[in-house]
Every structure is written in C-alpha cells, then in structure tokens.
Amino acid sequence: MRRILPILALLIFISGCGVNQNTNNSNTESNAKSSSISTQDSSKMTKLDSHLTVAKQALSAGDYAKAIEEATASIKDNPNNADAYSLRGLATALNGDTTKGLADTKKAYDLDPNNVANYYNMAMVYKLQGQLNESKQWFEKVLEKDPSNTWSVYGIATIYADQGDDTKALDWLEKAINIDPSVKAVAAEQDHFERFHNNTRFKTLVGL
C-alpha cells in the first residue's frame, strides 16, 4: 500500500485540477450557447456536475466503489463525458480491475485527446498493471503540456527506481524535489526508494 496511497493522494489533486480546467473550458463554451440550452438540460448538467464532485470525493477517501458508482451515473447522464470515464477508469483500476480501468481511460482519451489529467490517470493505470514503459510514456505526455508537473516527474523517478536504473531514478527525483520540496517526505516513505536508504545521494536529496 505504501507504493500506491501516497501517490494516490497527490494524484487526486492533479486529477481534480485537470477536471476543473476542463469544466471551466466547457463552461466558457456553454455560456456562448446558453440561449439554446433548455431548463431541463441545465438541470441535467447540474446533476452531472454533482455526480462528478461526489465521485472525486469518494476517490479521495479511498471509496472506489462509490467513485465508480457516481462516475457511472455521470456517464449515464452524458455518454460523452470524458472526465467521468477518466475518473471511473482510475477508480476501477485502484479497485483491482486494471483491464476495465484502462478501457475507461482509453475511452476518455478517445472523447477528449487533450485532457492532460487523463494522461496522468492513464499513466497511473498502466503503472498499476506493471506496464512501466507505457506508464512512463504517458507521464512524458503530461510533461509535454506541463513541464513542471511535479508528480509526473516523480512518477518517472519511481519507474526508473523500479526498473533498477538508480542514476536516472535519482536524477528525476532531484528534478521533482526542485519543483516541490514536499516530494522529499513522500520519497522517504515509499517502497520504490526503500533500497536507496543507504545511498548517500538519496539521503542528501530527501534529508535522511
């Protein structure tokens, strides 16, 4: 669990930001079309947003079943809701079914290939599957759009650590710490870096 939960807590922050950004973009577009939206459609959108909010809260609390249920309700209201597919995919993968989780995040990508939050979620699902090279590629896609995305940089560091490439693992860990020093505490506790605890460079980086 120490390999997943610290990342999850940070992941939810990033996923939430991504969803909020997409929602803001959608709201801007919706405002331009407001004259053509009926009261019924507006009510449905409010309900949809509520489902997503509850789903994110459930995911943050580790209640994956509830997150899946609420994201599914969002999809029922709007079958083209990329954010809901992405969130459901991550929750499903964390709940143990990485195959279904990956299918949902891929569906989210098909619906909205520019959703950077979904890139991160796909990276995490691939990571949960043990497909580290694929995971790294999606973290890299996040960094193409957001070069200072701390937890994608850190994600790549953990992949190199798991693959036994110590030099690259520490190089990427240093990059992540330079962006956000709070990474130190996470790295010091995670199993990815447990074997590094006697490594002089690692101890210097995280302050052990």
Question: Where are the regions that the model predicts?
Answer:
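Alpha-helical segment of the N-proximal tetratricopeptide repeat
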Residues: 44-83, 94
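Position-specific recognition of the canonical hydrophobic site in helix A of tetratricopeptide repeat
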Residues: 59, 86, 92-93, 127, ...
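Structural signature of tandem alpha-helical TPR/SEL1-like repeats
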Residues: 61-70, 94-107, 129-141, 164-172, ...
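Structural marker of alpha-solenoid helical repeat scaffolds
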Residues: 77, 111, 145, 179-180
